[in-house]
């Protein structure tokens, strides 16, 4: 595939992969990953441990070479040095020099980028303010809590106003207030045109901020699309007593269920079948106390997809 021209690169997706594959000896870590991340969108990359998420990120950052397939980042082949200067990255495992102040850590990364020295103070001030550390810039990192260090790591990722930011579990060390702050930062990034590639196990958080999601398992995408496209299912929770084990089993004709005590949730039940369900429960000797429509959450859909896969 020929390299795009400057005009094409500027209008191309933030990320585009075609059958991206990575093998380590006889182990397939990534098996034909194909996906597109538009610019200016928040993209959730989800999957269980061992699904291939970390391998995919390393390939996109140019830290690993693919076994097969292609990956383009900001219109250029993954790993292109000039393109990497336009990318911010917060790794899941972050550790900064404990003897340096927050400002010194940010200055070090300004130098590594490298950013023009004349812009350093402005960049550092903006990063500290954005992540809520404006009054701690002179303090040594060794005095910071883990949550404060994660905020600092996010500040590092934002230096230079990148066009694409990879965030790997960006709120794992934060309290609820900190998580709320980071969600706001992520939304602000998207509003200014920055694409955000978000890897998080906090699915409720992903549901709140992401425009688009891909679910991966065993190194391949098993579902993807906008949040609206992914969460199309309907569910109904019924509180019922008096059903025998056989009676409850016979209700499987109404679709997958999740039972807990007196409550049975039918995870893929169309609304027009609810009267039929209630009538069947009564016929089986059940006493129905409550029927509640339930919005399908991203966690519901995620678990359902993994079960089906």
Task: Annotate each predicted stretch with a short phrase.
Residues 228-232:
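Short acidic-hydrophobic catalytic motif
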């Amino acid at each position: 595939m020929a390299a795009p021209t400057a005009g094409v690169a500027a209008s191309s997706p933030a990320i585009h992969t075609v059958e991206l594959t990575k093998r380590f000896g006889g182990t397939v870590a990534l098996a034909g990953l194909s996906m597109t991340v538009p610019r200016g969108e928040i993209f959730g990359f989800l999957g269980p441990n061992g699904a291939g998420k970390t391998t995919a990120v390393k390939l996109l950052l140019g830290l690993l070479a693919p076994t097969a397939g292609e990956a383009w980042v900001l219109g250029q082949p993954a790993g292109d040095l000039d393109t990497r200067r336009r990318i911010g990255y917060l790794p899941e495992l972050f550790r900064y020099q404990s003897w340096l102040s927050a400002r010194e850590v940010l200055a070090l990364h300004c130098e590594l980028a490298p950013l023009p020295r004349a812009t350093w103070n402005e960049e550092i001030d903006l990063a500290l303010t954005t992540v809520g550390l404006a009054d701690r810039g002179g303090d040594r990192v060794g005095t910071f809590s883990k949550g404060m260090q994660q905020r600092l790591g996010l500040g590092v990722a934002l230096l230079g106003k990148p066009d694409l930011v990879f965030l790997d579990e960006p709120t794992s060390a934060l309290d609820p207030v900190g998580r709320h702050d980071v969600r706001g930062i992520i939304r602000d990034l998207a509003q200014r045109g920055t694409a955000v590639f978000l890897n998080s196990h906090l699915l409720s958080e992903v549901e709140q901020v992401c425009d688009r999601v891909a679910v991966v398992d065993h190194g391949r995408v098993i579902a993807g699309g906008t949040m609206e496209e992914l969460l199309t299912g309907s569910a109904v929770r019924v509180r019922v007593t008096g059903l025998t084990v056989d009676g409850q089993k016979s209700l499987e004709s109404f679709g997958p269920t999740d039972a807990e005590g007196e409550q049975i949730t039918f995870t893929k039940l169309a609304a027009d079948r609810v009267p039929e369900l209630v009538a069947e429960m009564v016929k089986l000797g059940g006493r129905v106390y409550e029927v509640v429509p339930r919005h399908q959450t991203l966690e519901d859909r995620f678990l359902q997809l993994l079960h089906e896969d």
